[in-house]
Amino acid sequence: MGIFITPLWSEYIVSADQGGIFMDHFNVYSDIQARTGGEIYIGVVGPVRTGKSTFIKRFMELLVLPGLEDVHARERARDELPQSSAGKTIMTTEPKFIPKEAAKLSLGDGVEVRVRLIDCVGFMVEGAAGHIENEKERMVRTPWYEEEIPFTAAAELGTRKVITDHSTIGLVVTADGSFGELKRENYVPAEEKTVQELKKLGKPFLVLLTSSRPYSEETRNLAKELETKYEVCVMPVNC
């Protein structure tokens, strides 16, 4: 069974080399469908501790799981959902494709695609926890090196690979500092780095600004500032 998704991102998905000019949403989706053979990989990237994993869980719960008629397939997909929690501690440790098997989504107007989301650690931010152990940076194993490497280096490498090698569309998730224990300014350097990487590659992307008060005037003003700064549309959301 396929899942119908209204074109929520319609005019918001733009290519960096278009200078922020909006495209008709069906033209965007049809073009991506043609270029990718109907397989769309959404790279959910950005700073750590912004709600990337929470967004993926909500996306799956609302758009993917209800469309899985096979109860065993549905339970397997549910078991694959990423962990998420409040606070400063980083929960994600490596890139992960979700669901394991691509889910069919109907975008309307005869456009059908198969979608997978890619979760990743994200670029490090000041104040985050979980990468230091016994006053030293954790050393972790990765699929890319035989030896262990520092957690921060692994997180950066994995995030860049999601952006460069795996994603068809980028979804930059950042935060306004209204929830959790990190301030808005902590996220800015990693946020800028993520946007620069996507623009350099010319990949279509949009920005989600996670907030505990997405409809407030303050949050909407920040979204407008980021739209001007990055020349893409920014959507305030509460995941």
Language-model segments: which ranges?
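Amphipathic helical hotspot of TIR/SEFIR-family domains
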Residues: 157-158, 179-202
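Conserved G1/Walker A P-loop phosphate-binding module
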Residues: 24-139
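Short, Lys/Arg-enriched N-terminal segments with co-localized hydrophobic residues
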Residues: 3-22
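Conserved nucleotide-binding/hydrolysis micro-motifs of P-loop NTPases
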Residues: 121-124, 176-179, 212-215
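Short glycine-/polar-rich loops that comprise or flank the Walker A/P-loop
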Residues: 113, 166-169, 201-204, 230-233
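Inter-motif core of Ras-like GTPase G domains
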Residues: 129-179
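Canonical P-loop GTPase G-domain recognition
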Residues: 204, 211-239
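Structural beta-sheet core signal
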Residues: 172, 207-209
